[in-house]
C-alpha cells in the first residue's frame, strides 16, 4: 500500500497558551491511528520535525499510528523565542499545550538530541501522559567524564548559529554523521535555506546561550522517576553527545534498554533508517 505523505498537506498551526507561554506552534499531523507517536527534533540550525524524521514516517503510518511532528519554539515555522531558563522544560510545556489542544491524553514520544531532553522533561512533569519513550542521542544534560566539553560537534553547532554560512554548515554536518558521503548538496542547500529563512531564530539561540549557557539541565538525579518503558538509541561514533550519556540514561531509567549502532553519528534515525524503524516498531508493538 502506498501512503501519501507530504509536508504541505500535513502542515498545521496552533496557538499555544500554557503557563507563561503564548505563541504559535507549527506541527505536522499524519495518520488516524488509535495510538499517537509524537516526534521531537534536535537543536541544530534549520532543524524541523519534518527534516529530522522524514525517513521514519512511512513505517509508523503503515503500522497504524498517528504521527505528530512538533516544531519546537524557536525553530522552523514556529514562533521565535529567547529562552533564558531550561530549554528542555520550555519545549515540554509547549508539547503539553499542543497535546491539550489536540485532545491527546496519552502518547508515545520519540525525541532526538534536544528532542530527547524535552521528552524526558515532559515525562517527569506529566508521567501519566506518556506511553513509551524513545530517546536518541540525548535525554539529559551534564558533563561527560570521558570527553572534553563542549564536544567537537556542539562547538561547530554554536559556531554555525553565529556565522550561518554554507561552509560552516558543511563543517557541522560532516561531524554530525559517520559517513559524510551520504550528505548531498541538495540536503545542504535545503538546510541552509531553512536556516536563513528565519534569521531571528539564529539570533535568538545565540542570545539564549548568552543568558543561560546550560539550556539543557542534568536530569540524572530524577531519571529513576520515569516509569515509562524506554528505548535508548545511540550512535557509537556520536561526536555531539558522547555515548556515556546513553549509559547514564540506561542506569537511571528503571525500565529501559539501550541499542547502539556502530558506524553511526548523532543522527541514528537518518543514518540507519531501516534498522532504526524496525527497532522502534518492535519496541512500540510489544
Swiss-Prot record:
Xref: Pfam families: Abhydrolase_1 (PF00561)
Q: Which GO terms describe its molecular function?
A: 2-hydroxy-6-oxonona-2,4,7-trienedioate hydrolase activity; 2-hydroxy-6-oxonona-2,4-dienedioate hydrolase activity; protein homodimerization activity
Q: Where is this site: Transition state stabilizer?
A: 113
Instruction: For this UniProt record, give its keywords in alphabetical order, as a comma-separated list.
Output: Aromatic hydrocarbons catabolism, Hydrolase
Q: Where is this site: Catalytic role in ketonization of the dienol substrate (substrate destabilization)?
A: 191
The UniProt family comment states: Belongs to the AB hydrolase superfamily. MhpC family.
Its subunit composition reads: Homodimer.
Name of the protein in its database record: 2-hydroxy-6-oxononadienedioate/2-hydroxy-6-oxononatrienedioate hydrolase 2
Gene it is expressed from: mhpC2
Amino acid at each position: 500500500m502506498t501512503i501519501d505523505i507530504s509536508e504541505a498537506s500535513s502542515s498545521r498551526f496552533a496557538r499555544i497558551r500554557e503557563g507563561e507561554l503564548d505563541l504559535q506552534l507549527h506541527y505536522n499531523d499524519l495518520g488516524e491511528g488509535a495510538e499517537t507517536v509524537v516526534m521531537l527534533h534536535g537543536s541544530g540550525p534549520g532543524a524541523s520535525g519534518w527534516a529530522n524524521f522524514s525517513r521514519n514516517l512511512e513505517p509508523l503510518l503503515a503500522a497504524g499510528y498517528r504521527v505528530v511532528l512538533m516544531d519546537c519554539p524557536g525553530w522552523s515555522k514556529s514562533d521565535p523565542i529567547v529562552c533564558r531558563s531550561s530549554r528542555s522544560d520550555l519545549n515540554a510545556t509547549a508539547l503539553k499545550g499542543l497535546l491539550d489542544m489536540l485532545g491527546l491524553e496519552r502518547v508515545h514520544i520519540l525525541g532526538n538530541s534536544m528532542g530527547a531532553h524535552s521528552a524526558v522533561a515532559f515525562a517527569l512533569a506529566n508521567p501519566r501522559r506518556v506511553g513509551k519513550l524513545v530517546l536518541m542521542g540525548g535525554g539529559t544534560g551534564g558533563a561527560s567524564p570521558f570527553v572534553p566539553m563542549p564536544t567537537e560537534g556542539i562547538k561547530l553547532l554554536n559556531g554555525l548559529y553565529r556565522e550561518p554560512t554554507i561552509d560552516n554548515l558543511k563543517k557541522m554536518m560532516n561531524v554530525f554523521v559517520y559517513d559524510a558521503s551520504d550528505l548531498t548538496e541538495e540536503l545542504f542547500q535545503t538546510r541552509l535555506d531553512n536556516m536563513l529563512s528565519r534569521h531571528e531564530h539564529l539570533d535568538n539561540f545565540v542570545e539564549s546561550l548568552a543568558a543561560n549557557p546550560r539550556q539543557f539541565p542534568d536530569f540524572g538525579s530524577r531519571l529513576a522517576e520515569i516509569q515509562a518503558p524506554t528505548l535508548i538509541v545511540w550512535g557509537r561514533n556520536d561526536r555531539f553527545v558522547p555515548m556515556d550519556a546513553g549509559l547514564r540514561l540506561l542506569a537511571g531509567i528503571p525500565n529501559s534498554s539501550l541499542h547502539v549502532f556502530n558506524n553511526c553519528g548523532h543522527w541514528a534515525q537518518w543514518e540507519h533508517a531501516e534498522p532504526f524503524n524496525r527497532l522502534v516498531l518492535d519496541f512500540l508493538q510489544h
